[in-house]
Amino acid sequence: MGMTMTQKILAAHASLDSVKAGDLIMADLDMVLANDITGPVAINVFGTIDKEKVFDKDKIALVPDHFAPAKDIKSAQQCKQVRCFACDQEITNYFEIGEMGIEHALLPEKGLVAAGDVVIGADSHTCTYGALGAFSTGVGSTDMAVGMATGKAWFKVPAALRFNLTGTLNKNVSGKDLILHIIGMIGVDGALYRSMEFTGPGVACLSMDDRFTISNMAIEAGGKNGIFPVDDQTISYMEEHGSGDYKVYAADADAVYEKTFDIDLSQLKSTVAFPHLPENTKTVDAIEEPVTIDQVVIGSCTNGRFEDLKRAADILRGKHVKKGVRMLVIPATHKIYLDAMEAGYLREFIEAGATISTPTCGPCLGGYMGILAEGERCVSTTNRNFVGRMGHVDSEVYLASPEVAAASAILGRIATPDEL
């Protein structure tokens, strides 16, 4: 019986010839990650472990991004605790204000994750790095602490779902529409503790930024991880970002999948997830009554990358955000910020009536920089739209692609670029 891509990576890191779904293993870790919310909890737990130093100061990443720059005294204290721990432990990959970014955009950009790696992070969207052909998954702060101390973590080997992609995406349809389509199709628990393995000729038409978006939201279907095969695009990205040594794992021809979903990318349309779950999806052309909005957010670890900003800027160029609508643009890292500035996109956003933020998770988790009031509606390129996720419990969040978000900002209602 063959192994999936995920199972091969886990077997190698557990020094086993093979594994199967349901096996319990102890695996070596290539990177352990935390932020300013989960980091302090992990640091407190680390203090109770009989270890004075982390297992490898080069394999820990600490990124203050959720409430950074600090929004209040409490968040400042949390950032300080992470900062002091990083200093005491001489953590190589601690990223301070001015060099930080949203963690799941920053680590690939810095070359800290490569194909074949095993990565855990005390953040549920750590599954993002599957876009690079790595096994990455979110864990609790206790597992994070043990990972920092030992360089190991235990896993139950996941069963797998295969998503066989064919065709190519149409204009103004992107990876966000694909993952929303999938979550709408299988539900928020449709991939519960499964690896979501994306295969097929359609993968080649997906950019790296599209793949990051798709892997990022695997957790919104309950997935343990979401992983893409390594191809020329992946290798070019890793070489460009100095990812260092990598190893390519490919699924066996007789790998076992619980189910295969065939998806023709050319049939996908602009898709939005209605409140209050990512599975509540509709194609925009199926929305019967106009959904007017108060705010648009383009950013986050899901859609704050350069290509996302380019797509939005191309739509906004020469147009203006509708009066009464607030539009926030949040580049995911400082490099993306600079690249967008040099490309002229930030000027175009500002001239269109948007405001630009320093890199931060901010409004995505209802932290700050764009909190919603009672009764307000927001179209957001983020990844969750739970009750109260971005503010008041009686506010509403609609998840969408950068293309739909930009068009909606212009028209003041959920719309596609085709309507402009």
Swiss-Prot record:
Give induction info.
By nicotinic acid.
Which pH dependence is annotated? Highly active between pH 6.5 and 9.0. Retains 50% and 10% of maximum activity at pH 5.0 and 4.5, respectively.
Per UniProt, [4Fe-4S] cluster binds at: C301, C361, C364
Per its record, the protein catalyses: (2R,3S)-2,3-dimethylmalate = dimethylmaleate + H2O
Q: Write the Enzyme Commission number(s) for this entry.
A: 4.2.1.85
Give one GO term, molecular function aspect.
4 iron, 4 sulfur cluster binding
**Which pathway is recorded for this entry?**
Cofactor degradation; nicotinate degradation; propanoate and pyruvate from 6-hydroxynicotinate: step 7/8
Q: Which Pfam families match?
A: Aconitase
Q: Which cofactor does it need?
A: [4Fe-4S] cluster
The GO annotation for biological process reads: L-leucine biosynthetic process; nicotinate catabolic process
| Protein name as catalogued | 2,3-dimethylmalate dehydratase large subunit
Recite the lineage of the species.
Bacteria, Bacillati, Bacillota, Clostridia, Eubacteriales
